[in-house]
Every structure is written in C-alpha cells, then in structure tokens.
C-alpha cells in the first residue's frame, strides 16, 4: 500500500515506502539516531550552534561574572554539540551502520532481500552481532512490527524518543 497514511512529526505525509526509508531493517529509527544526517538531533544541534554564536567568549566571562563554575564545562558541551551537528550517517538502508560497525543486519537483509528482520525464516538469529540489550530490543521491535504492522509501529513510536 503506497497511499498516504498520516503526518509524521514534521507534519509531512508518510507512505509505506517513506516509513521503510526512515527505519533500519532491524526496526530501529534511523531518523531519530543522533548520527543521522537528516535527523532531528542534527537539525536541532545546528540550530543551537547558530543561536549560541560566539558563546565561547561569554562562557569565560560568565564564569567570573556569575561565579558559576558550570561555564568551565562549555568547551566540552560545544565539542559534543559539534559532534551532533556533523554530517555522519545516511541511514542503514543507504550505507553500513555507523553506530554498530559490526552490525550484521544490513548485509543479511540485502542477501535475503527482505525489508525487515521479522520477515526472515531464521528470525531471530545470531547474525546481528548485537550486544545483549540491543539484541533483546531487536527481537521485541520485530515481533511488534510482525504483529501490528509497520504503519502502526511507526505511528506508535513517532513521538517517542529514540533513547529511552
């Protein structure tokens, strides 16, 4: 079904193909990942960098003027913000996952020619190379997608943070 389903969080209509493009074959949301080039975290980080301008200079002054040592930590904050704002990943369907270098899902899904892991006869398997926590989440997510359908899963998780 390629019809219009509903608005996403950016108020754009989403089709099944667009939903598939936003989710990795494992079921995790690439768009919500901090490393995604078109993700909210990168977009908000770029905006915050723009709004902060040359705050480096002021952070040093505020440390003295306000007597608050928290401003000593601004360089660390800025380093993290710069990292979040950098172009990093185009999503697991477009390139090898940059978050999990040993991820076995992309190669497997291409080999098996499936959209999501739950569609595989061998699901769940040990080809993912995920740690225990991610493996459990992967199984749970794919079981939900299998039982509820991708549209319902996407809609249900649309406004939920990626990192919960």
Residue ranges and their predicted role:
Residues 13-164:
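Cysteine-centered metal-binding/redox modules
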């Amino acid at each position: 079904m390629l019809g219009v389903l509903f608005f996403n969080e950016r108020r754009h209509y989403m089709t099944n193909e667009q939903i598939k493009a936003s989710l990795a074959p494992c079921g995790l949301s690439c768009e919500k990942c901090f490393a995604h080039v078109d993700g909210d975290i990168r977009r908000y980080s770029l905006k915050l960098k723009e709004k902060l301008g040359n705050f480096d200079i002021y952070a040093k002054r505020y440390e003295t003027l306000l007597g608050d040592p928290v401003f000593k930590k601004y360089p660390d904050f800025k380093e993290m913000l710069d990292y979040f704002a950098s172009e990093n990943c185009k999503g697991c369907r477009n390139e090898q996952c940059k978050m999990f270098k040993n991820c076995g899902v992309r190669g497997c899904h291409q080999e098996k020619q499936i959209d999501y892991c739950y569609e595989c006869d061998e699901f769940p398997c040990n080809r993912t190379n995920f740690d225990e926590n991610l493996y459990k989440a992967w199984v749970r997510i794919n079981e939900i997608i299998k039982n509820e359908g991708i549209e319902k899963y996407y809609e249900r998780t649309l406004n939920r943070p990626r990192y919960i």
